[in-house]
Amino acid sequence: MAKVNVRDFIEEQYGLFINGEFQASESGDTLTVTNPANGEDLAKVAKASKSDVDKAVQAAQDAFDSWSKTSKEERADYLLEISRRIHEKVEHFATIESLQNGKPYRETSTIDVPLTANQFKYFASVLTTDEGSVNEIDENTMSLVVNEPVGVVGAVVAWNFPILLASWKLAPALAAGNTIVIQPSSSTPLSLIELAKIFQEVLPKGVVNVLTGKGSESGDAIFNHEGVNKLSFTGSTDVGYGVAKAGAERIVPTTLELGGKSANIIFDDANLDQVVEGAQLGILFNQGEVCSAGSRLLVQSSIYDKVMPKLKEAFENIKVGDPFDEDVKMSAQTGPEQLEKIESYVKIAEEDSNANILTGGHRLTDNGRDKGYFFEPTIIEIKDNSHQLAQEEIFGPVVVVEKFEDEAEAIKIANDSEYGLAGGIFTTNINRALNVAKAMRTGRIWINTYNQFPAGAPFGGYKKSGIGREIYKDAIKNYQQVKNIFIDTSNQTKGLY
C-alpha cells in the first residue's frame, strides 16, 4: 500500500450528527469501519438506535418551519457554499472515499468528489427556474400553482458511491426547502459524516442530520418513522421492496434507485478502440460495483472473433491493487461479503458447460493483496440470456458475453431482464443508435461511451430498477408537493343554491 497517514484524514471515532452537533448514540454502541484494500481498521462510528432516529427526526421537524420559508436565493447561496467547500477539499474527501471503499484514488479525486460538489452547484441553479404558474381560466377565475417542500426527508444510500449518492438526495431535497435525515451504509459512512462538518459550519441546525448505523435497524427506523414525509433510497432491489412497502403503508412518496443487469451492445460498425474502452468502463469502473454496470456485453456475431481477443488482452492488462498507486486501474471490492458473492457466481460458471470463463475468475492474494478483497477482471461467455449469470446482478468486475445476429435480436436480448436501469450502444450509425435506444426498456442509454453521470442528465430505472429520476432538474419535484390555489374574483354567487 502507498503510504497514507490515515489520521491526517480520518478521526479515530465519530458521533452522530443531530441538530447541528456531533454526539454519541444513546446506547453508546459503535461500529468499526475497515479498509477493504488491507483489512485495517479505520475508525469507529456511533451505532444509531430507534431513539437516535427519533431525535434526528425531531430536529429536522423543528428546523423545517424556518428552513422551508427561506428564499430561493438564500437556499441557492447555501448550496453554492457547500459546493465551494467540497471543491476546496477534494483531496481530503477523495482520500477518505478510497480508504473506506477501496476504489482507486484516480476515480474518487476526478469523478466521485467533483461530481458531488457539482450536484450542489447544479441544484442551486435549478432553483432559479423553479417557478410556479398562474392560469387565468376565465375573466373571473384564476388558478395559482405553487411548489412547496414535502417536509422531512428520510434517505439511505448505498456503499458503492457513498458521498456522491448522498449528494443526489441532499442537493435537490435542500433546494426544495426540505430538511433531511440521511444515513450512509454502515461499511462506508466516513465521507458523509466528514461532510457533516461542512453542514455544521454552513447550514442552520437541524436542516441536515447524519446518522450512522445498520440499515436493517436505524435505516428501517427512518423509513418507518411517522415524522418522515418522503423516502429516498439507493441500494439493492431486495431492500428496495421493503422501502417501497414502508412508503405504501403510510402513503408516503418514495424515490428508489435500485439494481440493474444492463446490456452493452456492440454492433459490427463500431469503433473497436471505443468498444474496448467502453466495455471496461461498463464493468471495471468502480470494480464493477455500479448499479448501471454494463454486465451483459452483447457482441454482433460478425465481429465476435475480432472483438474478444482484444477485450481479453485489455482485461488481462488491468493492474489491480493499491487504490493510491497511480498505475492501478482497479482496486478492492468493498468487503468480504461482496467478494464471496462474486466468487459464488464464478463457481456457477466453472460448473456449467454452457458457460466459459475466457479470462479471470480468481481472487488476487499475491504481491501484498492477501489482506484485501481483490478480484480479477473476468469475462464469461454464455450461450443463452436465460442463464442465471445473465439474469442476476453480480455487482463485481464480471461481464457475461453473448452473441447476436441483428438489431432485432439485440433488442430482444437486452429487454429480456427484470431490470431496466441502463444500457449502452456502440455503433457509428446514428439511425441504428437511436432506433435501438428507443426500443430498449431502460432509463439511461449511453451511446459510444458508458458510466458517465454528469448533472443535468436524468438517471433512474424502468421495471425493478426503481422509481423516479435523479441528477436532473426535475429531480427537485421528487421533494416537492404541488399546491393549487383557486380564486374566484367575481365577488358574486353562482346561484346554484
Curated annotation (Swiss-Prot):
Gene3D superfamilies in the record: Aldehyde Dehydrogenase, Chain A, domain 1 (3.40.605.10), Aldehyde Dehydrogenase, Chain A, domain 2 (3.40.309.10)
Enzyme Commission number: 1.2.1.3
Pfam families: Aldedh
Class of enzymatic activity (EC top level): oxidoreductase
Protein residues bound to NAD(+): 213-219
Keywords linked to the UniProt accession: NAD, Oxidoreductase
Family to which this protein belongs: Belongs to the aldehyde dehydrogenase family.
Database matches in PANTHER family: ALDEHYDE DEHYDROGENASE-RELATED
Catalytically driven reaction(s): an aldehyde + NAD(+) + H2O = a carboxylate + NADH + 2 H(+)
Name the record gives this protein: Putative aldehyde dehydrogenase AldA
Coiled coil region boundaries: none
InterPro entries: Ald_DH/histidinol_DH (IPR016161), Ald_DH_C (IPR016163), Ald_DH_CS_CYS (IPR016160), Ald_DH_CS_GLU (IPR029510), Ald_DH_N (IPR016162), Aldehyde_DH_dom (IPR015590)
Originating gene: aldA
Active site: 257, 291
Originating species: Staphylococcus haemolyticus (strain JCSC1435)
Example GO molecular function: aldehyde dehydrogenase (NAD+) activity
